[in-house]
């Protein structure tokens, strides 16, 4: 009996020694180290051509439009609110197509951000397309997956190289202006382009709708891609000293607590350089109806004017 126990103990010791030795000698599979990101972070590039930017074709221009002569299904993309597929077009380029309610709103949102100098994804709205084996769909967003860009993870709203800068403050205000209530870090992406790290918002689908500022009703009242709801929603609430209180009912509401009048006027001055025709083109590119284009364009212009008209609140009496 004792001999049996001793043999068992020695077998256990031998097994442990073998496992330690295998780790030290490299037999065990080493953990893959996370590659450190190197490059110059870029969120926004100062544009000198806002008034002439093409908001119909957007950041990809005519050159990057998908070749629809032949579409090949690759796989289904998991995650998110909308159904998504990875496909290859007739030129052999890969795309992630988004089907459903978010396709139109995201297409327009990307174009407005691009028009002001923000780094964005490249996308196009295709009114009707057949994906072999999956079906025929209307209003499909094609988002490019170019070979020269490496998707290098997400970035955080509260921890990034641009905290406190006008461009990040302006981006926050833009999110409230287009009613993007889904401000999750997981909706952001870093795109490595050569020696630059492009900080972009990868999911702008939950825009041009409405979300209540009352926490209890937030999940029941929120909408996306609803021009009528967007036009009826509020944007600006009040000025407290030199701070701006925006009507924002989305996730990460704390992001909107440090907006100054100077921040608002900075982004407002950029928006004011867009013509009504350019703003209309951003919505026309997403295949909205003429009536919806008028409604959305008018609301964006009205909100721009609100930003430009803000002045510090006058305090009367003692503090």
Question: Where would I find each of the regions flagged by the language model?
Answer:
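Regulatory N- and C-terminal appendages and interdomain linkers associated
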Residues: 5-73, 92, 276-319
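Conserved, well-structured beta-alpha core segment at the onset of a catalytic domain
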Residues: 6, 19-24, 91-94, 100-101, ...
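Conserved ATP-binding subdomain of kinase catalytic cores across diverse folds
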Residues: 59-158
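Extracytoplasmic/secreted envelope proteins and their assembly/folding machinery
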Residues: 84, 106, 110, 171-174, ...
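Solvent-exposed, acidic/flexible segments
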Residues: 99-106, 163-170, 177, 181, ...
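Conserved kinase catalytic-core segment
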Residues: 111, 153-223
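Short polybasic/polar patches that bind polyanions
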Residues: 114, 179, 284
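C-terminal catalytic region of ATP-dependent kinase domains
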Residues: 197-319
